[in-house]
Amino acid sequence: MDKSKLFLKSKRSFRRRLPPIGSGDRIDYRNMSLISRFISEQGKILSRRVNRLTLKQQRLITIAIKQARILSSLPFLNNEKQFERTESTPRTTGPRTRKK
């Protein structure tokens, strides 16, 4: 058996991921369907590593998101969970005592 062939790895084919922004997509503050893909649940801008964008695309996305926020077509924060009504303990109507 030839020793040089023992250490060669078989070449596995892999499927290249499609870029999140196509060539026809315009990065614009009015394109809400595109912008919303790059925002987290809390309304934060996702990082470039998570988005798999180039540096130029990430910069353009960030500028578009900030413009949309300023023009109030996008909220700065998305904290609906913060204001949800939860089960609270009933308040007592007895006399109050001061702590000394």
From Swiss-Prot:
Highest taxon, organism lineage: Eukaryota
UniProt keyword terms in alphabetical order: Chloroplast, Plastid, Ribonucleoprotein, Ribosomal protein, RNA-binding, rRNA-binding
InterPro entries: Ribosomal_bS18 (IPR001648), Ribosomal_bS18_CS (IPR018275), Ribosomal_bS18_sf (IPR036870)
NCBIfam families assigned to the protein according to its UniProt record, in alphabetical order: S18
Region (Disordered): 81-100
UniProt-annotated location(s): Plastid, Chloroplast
Amino acid composition bias (Low complexity), ranges on this chain: 89-100
Stated family: Belongs to the bacterial ribosomal protein bS18 family.
Biological classification of the source: Eukaryota, Viridiplantae, Streptophyta, Embryophyta, Tracheophyta
Subunit structure: Part of the 30S ribosomal subunit.
A family per Pfam: Ribosomal_S18
Gene: rps18
UniProt name for this protein: Small ribosomal subunit protein bS18c
Organism name: Nandina domestica
